[in-house]
C-alpha cells in the first residue's frame, strides 16, 4: 500500500480537498449549488399544537431491506438509507487521490444503539469492498458526533494520510423534536419560531497534515474552530451581540491577514431569532465588501436543521463554486451560549507571500 499508517499528524490542522452532500434541495458539489426549496408538510410529524410541521426531507432515497436495523432503531434505518444514497458520489471523491493511495473512512451517525452502529459500518464496508476503492481501504470506524471535525477524525493510534468523512443525520422525527438539545432550535408548532427539521448526508475528503509539514499547496487548510462562550443570546440586546460577533470576526481573521478578505460566509442557523441581525451587521462592519445575501449561505434555508451533519455540510457548502485561491468563513451560531468559527484558507499566492495583497 502506497500510504503507510502514521501517528505524527497535526491535531489542529486538516487539508480539505473536496466534498459532496445530498440535501433536500439536491446534490451539492464543488461545482454545483442547488436553489433552496421550501419545506413540505410532514404527513407524520406533529407539533405541540397537534398540527403537522413543515420539514425538509430528501425524496427518492435508496430502497434497503434491513429488518434488524428497523427493529433496533427507526432513526438508524433512516441514516442507513442516507448513507447508501450518497455513497456513490462520496466514493467518487477518492478519484482525486494518487493511485494506490490508502485512506480511512469515518462515519458520523448519531445512533443510540451500538448494535445498529455496527450494522451501518458493516454495510458500508461491504459496499466499499465490492468496488476498486476497497483495495486501499484502511480503518473504517463509527463516531456518534460530527460537530468537531478535528476531534472526530483524530488518529492518535495511527491512520492513513487521507480520510473520507461521511456525516449523516435526520432530525425529522418525534424523538429529536422534543429532545432537550434541540427543543430551542427546532420549530415546535405550526406557527412557532425555530428551524424546520431536516436531514442531509455529507462526504468530505481530507488530508491529515503532519506536525512538521508545511501548509498545503492546493486545497484548503482547516484549523480548529475558534470557540467563544457568552451569556445567552436571548438576554442580550442586538447591538451587544453584533459588537461581540464583530470582535470575534476581527480576532479570527485580522485585518492584516495575508489572505485578504474571505469570498464566502456559511452560517448554520440564519433563521433563528436575532441571528440575521447579529451576523449580518457584524459582517458588514468587518468586511463592507461582503454581502451576506449574495456571498452568504444559510444551511437552514437550504435544508433546515440537520443535526450532527451540519458541520460537514457547511464545509461542502463553503466549497461549492469556491475558486482555488479563495477563502471562506464558517459560523456556528445556533447555540444560545456559544459561537464557533472555522476558516477555509486557500494557498497563499506568491504575490501575497511577497507582500502584495491583491484582494
Predicted regions and their residues:
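Conserved "HGTGT" condensation-loop signature of ketosynthase/thiolase-family condensing enzymes
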Residues: 1-162, 167-172, 178-359
Amino acid at each position: 500500500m502506497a500510504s503507510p499508517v502514521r501517528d505524527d499528524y497535526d491535531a489542529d490542522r486538516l487539508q480539505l480537498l473536496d466534498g459532496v452532500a445530498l440535501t433536500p434541495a439536491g446534490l451539492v458539489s464543488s461545482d454545483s449549488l442547488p436553489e433552496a426549496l421550501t419545506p413540505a408538510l410532514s404527513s407524520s410529524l406533529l407539533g405541540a399544537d397537534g398540527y403537522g410541521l413543515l420539514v425538509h426531507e430528501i425524496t427518492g432515497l435508496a430502497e434497503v431491506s434491513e429488518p434488524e436495523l428497523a427493529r433496533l432503531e427507526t432513526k438508524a434505518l433512516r441514516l442507513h438509507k442516507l448513507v447508501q444514497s450518497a455513497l456513490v458520489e462520496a466514493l467518487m471523491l477518492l478519484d482525486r487521490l494518487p493511485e494506490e493511495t490508502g485512506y480511512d473512512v469515518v462515519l458520523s451517525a448519531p445512533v443510540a444503539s451500538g448494535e445498529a452502529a455496527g450494522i451501518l459500518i458493516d454495510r458500508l464496508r461491504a459496499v466499499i469492498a465490492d468496488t476498486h476503492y476497497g483495495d486501499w481501504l484502511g480503518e473504517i470506524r463509527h463516531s456518534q458526533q460530527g460537530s468537531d471535525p478535528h476531534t472526530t477524525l483524530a488518529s492518535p493510534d495511527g491512520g492513513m494520510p487521507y480520510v473520507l468523512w461521511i456525516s449523516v443525520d435526520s432530525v425529522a422525527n418525534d424523538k429529536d423534536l422534543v429532545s432537550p438539545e434541540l427543543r430551542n432550535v427546532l420549530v415546535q408548532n405550526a406557527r412557532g419560531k425555530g428551524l424546520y427539521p431536516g436531514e442531509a448526508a455529507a462526504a468530505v475528503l481530507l488530508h491529515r497534515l503532519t506536525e512538521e509539514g508545511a501548509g498545503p499547496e492546493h486545497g484548503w487548510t482547516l484549523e480548529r474552530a475558534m470557540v467563544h462562550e457568552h451569556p445567552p443570546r436571548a438576554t442580550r440586546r442586538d447591538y451587544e451581540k453584533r459588537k461581540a460577533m464583530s470582535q470575534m470576526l476581527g480576532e479570527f481573521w485580522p485585518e492584516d491577514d495575508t489572505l485578504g478578505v474571505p469570498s464566502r460566509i456559511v452560517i448554520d442557523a440564519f433563521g433563528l431569532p436575532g441571528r440575521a441581525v447579529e451576523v449580518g451587521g457584524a459582517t458588514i462592519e468587518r468586511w463592507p465588501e461582503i454581502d451576506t445575501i449574495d456571498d452568504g449561505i444559510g444551511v437552514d434555508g437550504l435544508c433546515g436543521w440537520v443535526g450532527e451533519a451540519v458541520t460537514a455540510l457547511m464545509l461542502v457548502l463553503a466549497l461549492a463554486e469556491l475558486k482555488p485561491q479563495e477563502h471562506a468563513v464558517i459560523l456556528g451560531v445556533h447555540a444560545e451560549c456559544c459561537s464557533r468559527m472555522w476558516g477555509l484558507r486557500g494557498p497563499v499566492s506568491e504575490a501575497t507571500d511577497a507582500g502584495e495583497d491583491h484582494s
